[in-house]
């Protein structure tokens, strides 16, 4: 009986430990950042409906007060929530393919309700009738937990290597 009880206690401790880790703020921010990146990856075979769903997923990750700054070769701009939603919709419907990879993700918890994710990024896009464009740079996401306990992006920065 003691061996069985010990075995059950060990199994329960492992399960509880895994759940605590899985639902920690850092892991939630990492999973949601991965989800954001997936909304920017477009396969040529994706249907228009599937691409529109990516815009829904993308905007659900954003706080209403989100700001975004892009500073890459030959392009600089700032975006609000409405701008990001419109631009993402245009993007997913007007590219043939897009591949965004984020490496060396570092998550710093700034407080109980704020976190910062930094990553190296590599992005390549093929537009309709346009040569493939590529950019390497840094991606920074500031996340904040809202009153409902959901993590949302409050600021996003995409900087080219030379910036």
What are these regions (language model features)?
Residues 5-22:
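Hydrophobic membrane-insertion alpha-helices, especially the h-region
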Residues 23, 27, 49-52, 78-82, ...:
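Soluble non-cytosolic domains of exported or imported proteins
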Residues 26, 31-61:
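Short acidic-aromatic low-complexity motifs
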Residues 37-44, 62-66, 88-95:
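Sec/Tat-exported extracytoplasmic proteins
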Residues 56-75:
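Short, solvent-exposed secondary-structure junction/capping segments
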Residues 83-129:
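Surface-exposed, charged secondary-structure patches
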Residues 114-116, 131-163:
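Short beta-strand edge/turn micro-motifs at domain boundaries
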């Amino acid at each position: 009986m003691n061996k069985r009880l010990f075995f059950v206690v060990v199994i329960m401790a492992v399960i509880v430990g895994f759940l605590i880790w899985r639902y920690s703020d850092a892991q939630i921010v990492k999973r949601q950042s991965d989800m954001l990146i997936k909304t920017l990856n477009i396969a040529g075979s994706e249907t228009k409906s599937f691409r529109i769903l990516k815009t829904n997923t993308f905007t659900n990750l954003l706080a209403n007060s989100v700001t975004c700054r892009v500073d890459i070769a030959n392009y600089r701009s700032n975006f609000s929530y409405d701008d990001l939603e419109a631009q993402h919709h245009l993007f997913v419907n007007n590219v043939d393919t897009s591949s965004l990879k984020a490496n060396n993700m570092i998550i710093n918890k700034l407080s109980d309700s704020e976190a910062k994710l930094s990553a190296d990024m590599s992005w390549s896009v093929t537009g309709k009738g346009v040569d493939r464009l590529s950019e390497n740079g840094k991606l920074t996401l500031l996340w904040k937990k809202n009153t409902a306990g959901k993590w949302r992006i409050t600021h996003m920065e995409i900087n080219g290597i030379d910036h």
